[in-house]
């Protein structure tokens, strides 16, 4: 700010209006004064400086570095190709899923290789360019100085007075030294230019050869990747087909096995059902009397009808067995010829002979089939059960016995004398040497029933079948409970006893579920004494006792009341 004059200062003193001082104005004034001082200090002592224009190096325009630094067009194959300087890059054809990532890595490597090639060429050319650029800058500076000197001479202003003769001598010596340096630099430039031309020719040859090799390598690599992908797709397709076929075959095999097991279980249940129905007949047949001479009065018609029915059943069974034997024989020439049907005239010996021949022909095949499927379907639980039953019957380990041996042992143990199975036998029958043998498979029959009951009880249909509601009968000795059908003995269950409930350490009580949430009702239907008194007192204005006393009058009072009116006597209750 310019200093105020005397008149302005006097005017400020005479002005009585209050002034508001802003602290920011003081700061602004101080800053402005400091800036003025700094500007003055910065320009002080530089009045004799000559104004010089901006140098070419300081121009903001782009600097032309040459053709070798200019960009060039590159094909996509050459861009994606791998660098020739990395020929030992391993690439696995099995890992085809990582081809895309590998291609991207190779593209990045190719770009880096190109950048390295350019950087190598630029490093060779930088010294020459920098030197040439520095020489050109010096020449331009010399030319600028000469032009400035000429302008100063033409203007003829009074700048020569500020320079002395000594300065002119120094400037002359500097000019001579600059001329010598310029000559040396020109010679160096010529040598460097020749070297640059040689390098450029070599670089051009390398540039023309590299794209060709890259294109060839890229084509070979694309062909390899396409072949690898095709092979991988083919392998995947075959693997998928193989896996699908394996899974389908396994599923079909499991389904077939399941259907076969269901069919076997159904057949076994049907046979067991038939055996259960025949149990009563077998028991009754074992209790039949010995063969006696028929009496003359016997009914011949009944015998003939029974004989005809038995022969019909026997013929049906024989036809069934012949059909099974023919199904086992594939050769038609070896099939058995069907005999004539049995009649009443056929002898018993011929019938027995035909049965024995059929049995001998089918025995080997039946035993082989039984052993085969017994080994296949034998599980851990079944094996344990069979082993226990075999050891009881044979006294040997169950693993060493086959199903046919077990069946033979059952048959041998079940064929006994008739006399031993009779409940009541005579003395003469026990000593008869020609006693007839009978068949009794009670042990085997009970084992079949046990297996059936355990299977049904373990299945989910145990509740619906009602097997869990069977009554358990107590045994005689109290060791356990016996099932009424299977005869199996249930192990005795140990009663749980609380050992801490003795000596008063724990209260003994039983909670009745029906009484747990029960509340006794209040009897509100009958009248109590208090309720009756309250009712009559509120109704008649008197207590019930007083009302009841009026009824207990003496005989004298009754005589006096006889003269009164009946209506008046009836209203006596309402008198005061």
Swiss-Prot record:
Biological process (GO) annotations held by this record are: maturation of SSU-rRNA from tricistronic rRNA transcript (SSU-rRNA, 5.8S rRNA, LSU-rRNA)
Q: Which domain of life is it from?
A: Eukaryota
Amino acid composition bias (Acidic residues), ranges on this chain: 95-123, 142-206, 552-568
Q: Does the keyword Oxidoreductase apply?
A: no
User: Where are stretches of biased composition, namely Basic and acidic residues?
Assistant: 39-49
Q: Which organism is it from?
A: Emericella nidulans (strain FGSC A4 / ATCC 38163 / CBS 112.46 / NRRL 194 / M139)
Q: Which PANTHER family match?
A: AATF PROTEIN APOPTOSIS ANTAGONIZING TRANSCRIPTION FACTOR, PROTEIN AATF
Report the InterPro entries cross-referenced here: AATF (IPR025160), AATF/Bfr2 (IPR039223), AATF_C (IPR012617)
Which subcellular locations apply to this protein?
Answer: Nucleus, Nucleolus
Query: Is Nucleus among this UniProt entry's keywords?
Result: yes
Assigned keywords, A-Z: Nucleus
State what protein this is by name.
Protein bfr2
Q: Which GO terms describe its cellular component?
A: nucleolus
Q: Which family does it belong to?
A: Belongs to the AATF family.
Positions of the UniProt region annotated as Disordered:
1-227, 328-351, 414-433, 548-576
């Amino acid at each position: 700010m310019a200093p105020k004059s005397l008149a302005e200062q006097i005017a400020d003193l005479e002005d009585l209006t209050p002034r508001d001082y802003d602290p920011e104005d003081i700061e602004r004034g101080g800053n402005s004064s400091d800036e003025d001082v700094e500007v003055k200090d910065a320009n002080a002592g530089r009045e004799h400086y000559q104004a010089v224009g901006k140098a070419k190096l300081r121009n903001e325009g782009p600097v032309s570095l040459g053709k070798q630094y200019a960009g060039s067009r590159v094909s996509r194959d050459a861009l994606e190709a791998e660098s020739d300087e990395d020929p030992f890059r391993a690439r696995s054809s099995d890992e085809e899923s990582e081809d895309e990532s590998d291609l991207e890595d190779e593209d990045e490597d190719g770009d880096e290789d190109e950048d390295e090639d350019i950087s190598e060429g630029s490093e060779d050319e930088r010294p020459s360019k920098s030197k040439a650029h520095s020489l050109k800058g010096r020449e331009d500076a010399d030319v600028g100085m000469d032009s400035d000197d000429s302008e100063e001479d033409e203007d003829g202003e009074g700048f020569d007075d500020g320079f002395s003769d000594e300065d002119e001598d120094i400037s002359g010596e500097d000019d001579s030294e600059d001329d010598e340096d310029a000559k040396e630099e020109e010679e160096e430039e010529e040598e460097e230019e020749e070297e640059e031309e040689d390098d450029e020719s070599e670089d051009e040859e390398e540039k023309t050869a590299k794209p060709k090799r890259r294109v060839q390598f890229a084509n070979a690599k694309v062909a390899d990747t396409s072949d690898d992908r095709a092979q991988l797709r083919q392998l995947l397709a075959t693997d998928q087909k193989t896996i699908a076929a394996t899974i389908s075959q396994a599923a079909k095999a499991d389904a077939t096995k399941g259907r076969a097991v269901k069919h076997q279980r159904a057949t076994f249940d049907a046979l067991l059902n038939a055996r259960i129905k025949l149990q009563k007949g077998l028991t009754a047949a074992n209790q039949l009397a010995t063969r006696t001479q028929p009496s003359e009065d016997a009914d011949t018609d009944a015998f003939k009808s029974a004989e005809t029915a038995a022969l019909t059943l026997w013929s049906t069974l024989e036809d069934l067995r012949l059909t099974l034997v023919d199904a086992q024989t594939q050769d038609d020439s070896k099939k058995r010829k069907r005999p004539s049907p049995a009649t009443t005239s056929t002898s018993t010996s011929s019938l027995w002979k035909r049965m024995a021949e059929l049995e001998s022909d089918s025995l080997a095949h039946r035993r082989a089939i039984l052993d085969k499927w017994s080994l296949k379907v034998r599980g851990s639980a079944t094996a344990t059960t069979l082993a226990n039953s075999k050891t009881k019957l044979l006294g040997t380990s169950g693993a060493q016995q086959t199903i046919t041996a077990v069946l033979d042992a059952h048959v041998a143990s079940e064929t006994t004398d008739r006399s031993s199975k009779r409940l009541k036998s005579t003395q003469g029958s026990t000593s008869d040497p020609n006693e007839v043998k009978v068949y009794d498979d009670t042990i085997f029959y009970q084992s079949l029933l046990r297996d059936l009951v355990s299977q049904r009880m373990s299945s989910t249909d145990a509740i619906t079948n009602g097997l869990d509601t069977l009554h358990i009968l107590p045994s005689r000795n109290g060791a356990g409970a016996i099932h009424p059908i299977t005869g199996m003995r249930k192990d005795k269950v140990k009663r749980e006893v609380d050992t801490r409930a003795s000596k008063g350490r724990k209260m003994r009580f039983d909670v009745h579920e029906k009484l747990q949430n029960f509340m006794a009702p209040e009897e509100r239907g009958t009248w109590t004494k208090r309720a009756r008194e309250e009712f009559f007192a509120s109704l008649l204005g008197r207590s019930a006792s007083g009302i009841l006393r009026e009824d207990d009058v003496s005989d004298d009072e009754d005589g006096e009341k006889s003269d009164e009116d009946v209506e008046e006597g009836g209203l006596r209750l309402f008198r005061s």
